[in-house]
């Protein structure tokens, strides 16, 4: 009996160029999300193979360079000064310490170093050390990503001039549900910063969180908002809520059905076919089987390391074991996709 080259057969199913669209309707997106599960996953995996190596996952590491004391009231966040989470506020880290952490992350297999500061927006005096961090990470041959809150046009330009590759600024959920999660800023504020970042020539990392009390419609609308931007975010992180004691949402949060989470990953892959879709926070609550389904649905990026800002992460040894079981290898191309750029 002749053997069948399954990888080649699977790739043969993905022999066309993915269609990039910015005009998705509510009805179209909802129909995809609610499609029979096998059909949804098949479509997402087929589209995934048109632009990416299906067995390679991009690895990032995230560091909190300034913890706590944030003026925003995000209902899920332990770093908000509005909530009693017993998390002390810290000063901005010394850039040398940040760069030291980036070296360790690179040695562990990370190709992108993400740095987060718990601010509503950075003050002008904060920009010099932040820029030093960006330049230091870039000097290591890594991609640099920052999340600092809302930016002015000038701050975005300074970051671009320093060589920042990505700016993370999540929209969290749908516009309709947003005020149930955050009241100190508007959904429009988020979109305004995304526009400034893109205008400055920085790539955008933008996604959301599942488990905030939203409905499936909100998940669909969140992704439709991103897919209908003039330029798709180059990275789309999908987080599962980790309820943190002392935050308002923790008191009412209910776990997300695993299949609903996987459906969200698949919809992101289908509507934004050339973006990295990141399986982000919440992996400690996911079984290996659930993570495998997420990769099958088109997730191709994770955070490595033991922590994500103030929440736990599986750690390198568990991720290596999972990758070995699934035949996945870390993507070591410093952000250049196997079949083209995002």
Swiss-Prot record:
PROSITE patterns xrefs: RADICAL_SAM
GO biological process annotation, one example: biotin biosynthetic process
Enzyme class label: transferase
Residue positions binding [4Fe-4S] cluster: 70, 74, 77
EC code(s) of this entry: 2.8.1.6
Cofactor list: [4Fe-4S] cluster; [2Fe-2S] cluster
Catalytic activity as recorded in UniProt: (4R,5S)-dethiobiotin + (sulfur carrier)-SH + 2 reduced [2Fe-2S]-[ferredoxin] + 2 S-adenosyl-L-methionine = (sulfur carrier)-H + biotin + 2 5'-deoxyadenosine + 2 L-methionine + 2 oxidized [2Fe-2S]-[ferredoxin]
Domain of life: Bacteria
Cofactor binding notes: Binds 1 [4Fe-4S] cluster. The cluster is coordinated with 3 cysteines and an exchangeable S-adenosyl-L-methionine.
Listed GO MF terms: 2 iron, 2 sulfur cluster binding; 4 iron, 4 sulfur cluster binding; biotin synthase activity; iron ion binding
Pathway recorded for this protein: Cofactor biosynthesis; biotin biosynthesis; biotin from 7,8-diaminononanoate: step 2/2
InterPro entries: Aldolase_TIM, BATS_dom, Biotin_synth/BioAB, Biotin_synthase, Elp3/MiaA/NifB-like_rSAM, rSAM
Oligomer and partners: Homodimer.
Name listed for the protein in its UniProt record: Biotin synthase
């Amino acid at each position: 009996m002749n053997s069948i080259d399954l990888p080649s057969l699977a790739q043969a199913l993905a022999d066309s160029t993915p269609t990039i669209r910015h005009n998705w309707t509510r009805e179209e997106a909802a129909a995809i999300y609610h499609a029979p599960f096998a059909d949804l996953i098949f479509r997402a995996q087929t589209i995934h193979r048109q632009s990416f190596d299906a067995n390679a996952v991009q690895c990032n590491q995230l560091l909190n360079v300034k913890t706590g004391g944030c003026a925003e009231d995000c209902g899920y966040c332990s770093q908000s000064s509005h909530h009693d989470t017993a998390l002390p506020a810290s000063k901005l880290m010394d850039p040398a310490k940040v760069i030291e952490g980036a070296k360790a992350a690179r040695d562990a297999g990370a190709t992108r170093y993400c740095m987060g500061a718990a601010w509503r927006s950075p003050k002008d005096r904060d920009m010099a050390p932040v820029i030093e961090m960006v330049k230091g990470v870039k000097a290591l041959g890594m991609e640099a990503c920052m999340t600092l809150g809302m930016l002015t046009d000038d701050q975005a330009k300074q970051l671009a001039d320093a060589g920042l590759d990505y700016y993370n600024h999540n929209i969290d959920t749908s516009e309709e549900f947003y005020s149930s999660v955050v009241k100190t800023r508007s959904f429009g504020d988020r979109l305004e910063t995304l526009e400034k970042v893109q205008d400055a020539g920085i790539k955008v990392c933008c996604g959301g969180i599942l488990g905030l009390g939203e409905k499936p419609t909100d998940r669909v609308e969140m992704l439709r908002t991103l897919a209908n931007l003039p330029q798709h975010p180059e990275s789309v992180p999908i987080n599962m809520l980790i309820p943190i004691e002392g935050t308002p949402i923790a008191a009412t949060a209910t776990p997300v059905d695993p299949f609903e989470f996987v459906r969200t990953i698949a919809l992101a892959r289908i509507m934004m076919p050339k973006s990295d879709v990141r399986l982000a926070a919440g992996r400690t609550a996911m079984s290996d089987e659930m993570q495998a389904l997420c990769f099958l649905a088109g997730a191709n990026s994770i955070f490595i390391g033991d922590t994500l800002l103030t929440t736990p992460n599986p750690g390198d040894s568990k991720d290596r074991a999972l990758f070995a079981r699934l035949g996945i290898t870390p993507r070591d191309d410093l952000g250049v996709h196997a079949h083209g750029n995002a």
